[in-house]
């Protein structure tokens, strides 16, 4: 009887782990889940256009990260600094037409702002939550975001 219970419990544990119960199965391995999206920090240096293209070519698609509230920024800041030990990453904000028509690379509405007045692409300092405009041709590490 005891062996039957032990085997049954063992099979239950295996079943639950394979079904994703209690595990973070919303994102691909190496990606982190937050509020319906998956995020991944890339420790590679690319210009803004190449970083955005790299994000769209990932298995789960996506774009450079867009922010819609302070809590999302805090999540990405913690994720970025933990992985990179650096404090600057590309984000998906850019003046696409160079006429101050700002928009996220994924088409989302710009509803949260934090920057100064310089070139047409944006970096985020992962410490201090400052957004700065930077030449799109410069290279930085970056964070991709995709729907879960």
Swiss-Prot record:
InterPro entries: C-type_lectin-like (IPR001304), C-type_lectin-like/link_sf (IPR016186), C-type_lectin/snaclec_domain (IPR050111), C-type_lectin_CS (IPR018378), CTDL_fold (IPR016187). A motif (Mannose-binding) lies at residues 118-120. Keywords: Calcium, Disulfide bond, Glycoprotein, Lectin, Secreted, Signal, Toxin. Residues 34-145 form the C-type lectin domain. Residues 1-23 form the signal peptide. It comes from the Eukaryota. GO terms for molecular function: carbohydrate binding; toxin activity. Disulfide bonds join 27-38, 55-144, 121-136. Glycans are attached at residue 47. GO terms for cellular component: extracellular region. The keyword Mitochondrion does not apply. Homodimer; disulfide-linked. Belongs to the true venom lectin family. Mannose-binding lectin which recognizes specific carbohydrate structures and agglutinates a variety of animal cells by binding to cell-surface glycoproteins and glycolipids. May be a calcium-dependent lectin. This is C-type lectin 2. It comes from Bitis arietans (African puff adder).
């Amino acid at each position: 009887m005891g062996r039957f219970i032990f085997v049954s419990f063992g099979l239950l544990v295996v079943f639950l782990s394979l079904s994703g119960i209690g595990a973070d199965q919303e994102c691909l391995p190496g990606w982190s889940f937050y509020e319906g999206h998956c995020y991944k920090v890339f420790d590679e240096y690319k210009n803004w256009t190449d970083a955005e293209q790299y994000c769209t070519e990932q298995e789960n698609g996506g774009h450079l990260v867009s922010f819609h509230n302070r809590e999302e920024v805090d999540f990405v800041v913690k994720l970025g600094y933990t992985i990179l030990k650096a404090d600057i990453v590309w984000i998906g904000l850019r003046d696409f037409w160079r006429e101050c028509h700002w928009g996220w690379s994924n088409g989302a509405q710009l509803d949260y702002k934090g920057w100064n007045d310089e070139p047409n692409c944006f970096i985020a300092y992962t410490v201090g939550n400052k957004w700065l405009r930077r030449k799109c041709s410069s290279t930085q590490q970056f964070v991709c975001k995709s729907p879960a």
